[in-house]
Amino acid sequence: MLMILLFQRLGIIMILAFLLVNNSYFRQLIEERSKREKLVLIIIFGIFVIISNMTGIEITSDKSLVERPILTTISHSDSLANTRTLVITTASLVGGPLVGTVVGFIGGVHRFFQGNFSGAFYIVSSALVGYISGRLGDQLKTNNLYPSTSQVIVISIIAESIQMLFVGFFTGWDLVKLIFIPMMLLNSLGSTLFLAILKTYLSNERQLRAVQTRDVLDLTQQTLPYLRQGLSQQSATKVCNIIKQHTNFDAVGLTDRTNVLAHIGVGQDHHIAGQAVKTDLSKSVILNGQPQIALDKTAIACPDQSCLLNSAIVVPLKINNETVGALKMYFSGDKKMTEVEENLALGLAQIFSGQLAIGIAEEQNKLANIAEIKALQSQINPHFFFNAINTISALIRLDANKARYALMQLSTFFRTSLQGGQDREISLEQEKAHVDAYMNLEKLRFPDKYQLDYHITVSTKMTLPPFGLQVLVENAVRHAFKERKKDNHICISITDQGEFYKVAVSDNGQGISPNMIDKLGQETVSESKGTGTALVNLNNRLNLLYGSASQLHFDSTDQGTTVWYEIPYQKGDKDEHFNS
């Protein structure tokens, strides 16, 4: 009889658990485990543990079972069979020792007051169960995954055994004989079911992210040749066809700021290339530069009453933070836009914006000085690009979040590279973002191999040549450390020297050979890992911009190398400063 009643209570807890795990906010909480997330988990499981106490089975002093819907109080001589230990164990496995201990303490305190100030030992036993379960769970985790089913069962048995030891010592072993087997089975089964549900959801989510990232990469590779041609009707039609073939959208469109460039799928009979943008939704996105989602025809606001498009996401395409068009994805019929489609559209728009920037830069390059542009373009090392792509491809299978992060870093790197190719000078902030993107990608390839530090005490308005830091940092990464696997430090220093800024990049590498150092920055060299063209190009641009006094200097010993140059002050340089 007790077993049946307890399993009824288990059903209540499992229903609540299913509703909880089905919530994306809760799944985010358990993956991050910051202080704020732990506090929220304590609140959630604290409520659960109180519910467990209040839905328990009352056992009188003569071992009779009393079933009441809600147990607000019980006699000090009575006991409870409940799911409290199950909730505490689950909280510990999900949130760790701290969450488990606090939830156990909450459950024990509530049980103490529920029993008319009897059973103080429950406070200690419940907190101890939470701590031990959490510690065991953390130690048994592999690859940031939860313990296996067999391990969860063992932890649950240990947790229930601890609780029963306290019950036996303080209330008598007859009660333990009555409730131990049902409670142990209940706790083991409940914890296993909860973790199984949770792991299934998390696994599906990770697989979905991996698929999304792979889809974005596939679409990026296929659309790159067309978007680099710029936004035209011909290139837009090719891109829309590719997206339509590789997604489940019913229609895909591209616009510039005023006209439809292409519309493939449902509605192409009246969303016609070359005509003005029709829908209020698209006009609003282009005007405000913010993505918008429409969940019905009214929100899309197409003037054609026969239009079958029922939901949409429209995302701006931007170059240098200026909206140049919009990517539009539609569903018809009863299909609705979900978070999956939203993330796909946002990711594509960001990548497409970068591809368009590449196209614009290439067009401008044709009109610029060919020799200088070739030198600038040499900064985007093709080996670095292919290494980054290979890293992202590997991460897709291992860690979708890291793959997405790497993709964004690569996008930042190329965007800042292309902006640098258009300008004679850029801000220190822009150059720093370029360096950070480069190093973040290198750190993904070689975790723990490099450490980059900044010592910057100058104005945020300071300008310097494009690649004025990145070239030197990349030079250190490629040449300074040879095969050394760790303790490789690079420091960027920009300081105020009175009449000029001193820009220096130092490393603790193995130094530069004396017969090589006089050639660097002055002429190309023959070396297995490069020719020094980037250093020559940077040195020439320093001379052109600031005169012969500003050129690369190399100080090197077997303890490391410092490469530095000077930049004269410019008006407004001392208004704002970094804190690095």
UniProtKB/Swiss-Prot annotation:
<dbReference type="Pfam" id="PF02518">
    <property type="entry name" value="HATPase_c"/>
</dbReference>
<feature type="transmembrane region" description="Helical">
    <location>
        <begin position="39"/>
        <end position="61"/>
    </location>
</feature>
<feature type="transmembrane region" description="Helical">
    <location>
        <begin position="176"/>
        <end position="198"/>
    </location>
</feature>
<dbReference type="Pfam" id="PF07694">
    <property type="entry name" value="5TM-5TMR_LYT"/>
</dbReference>
<dbReference type="GO" id="GO:0071555">
    <property type="term" value="P:cell wall organization"/>
</dbReference>
<keyword id="KW-0902">Two-component regulatory system</keyword>
<keyword id="KW-0067">ATP-binding</keyword>
<dbReference type="GO" id="GO:0005886">
    <property type="term" value="C:plasma membrane"/>
</dbReference>
<keyword id="KW-0418">Kinase</keyword>
<dbReference type="Pfam" id="PF06580">
    <property type="entry name" value="His_kinase"/>
</dbReference>
<keyword id="KW-1133">Transmembrane helix</keyword>
<keyword id="KW-0547">Nucleotide-binding</keyword>
<keyword id="KW-0812">Transmembrane</keyword>
<dbReference type="InterPro" id="IPR036890">
    <property type="entry name" value="HATPase_C_sf"/>
</dbReference>
<keyword id="KW-1003">Cell membrane</keyword>
<dbReference type="InterPro" id="IPR010559">
    <property type="entry name" value="Sig_transdc_His_kin_internal"/>
</dbReference>
<dbReference type="GO" id="GO:0000155">
    <property type="term" value="F:phosphorelay sensor kinase activity"/>
</dbReference>
<keyword id="KW-0808">Transferase</keyword>
<keyword id="KW-0597">Phosphoprotein</keyword>
<protein>
    <recommendedName>
        <fullName>Sensor protein LytS</fullName>
        <ecNumber>2.7.13.3</ecNumber>
    </recommendedName>
</protein>
<feature type="transmembrane region" description="Helical">
    <location>
        <begin position="86"/>
        <end position="108"/>
    </location>
</feature>
<feature type="domain" description="Histidine kinase">
    <location>
        <begin position="356"/>
        <end position="571"/>
    </location>
</feature>
<feature type="transmembrane region" description="Helical">
    <location>
        <begin position="152"/>
        <end position="169"/>
    </location>
</feature>
<feature type="modified residue" description="Phosphohistidine; by autocatalysis">
    <location>
        <position position="383"/>
    </location>
</feature>
<comment type="function">
    <text>Member of the two-component regulatory system LytR/LytS that probably regulates genes involved in cell wall metabolism.</text>
</comment>
<dbReference type="InterPro" id="IPR029016">
    <property type="entry name" value="GAF-like_dom_sf"/>
</dbReference>
<dbReference type="InterPro" id="IPR011620">
    <property type="entry name" value="Sig_transdc_His_kinase_LytS_TM"/>
</dbReference>
<feature type="transmembrane region" description="Helical">
    <location>
        <begin position="4"/>
        <end position="26"/>
    </location>
</feature>
<dbReference type="InterPro" id="IPR050640">
    <property type="entry name" value="Bact_2-comp_sensor_kinase"/>
</dbReference>
<keyword id="KW-0472">Membrane</keyword>
<feature type="transmembrane region" description="Helical">
    <location>
        <begin position="115"/>
        <end position="137"/>
    </location>
</feature>
<dbReference type="GO" id="GO:0005524">
    <property type="term" value="F:ATP binding"/>
</dbReference>
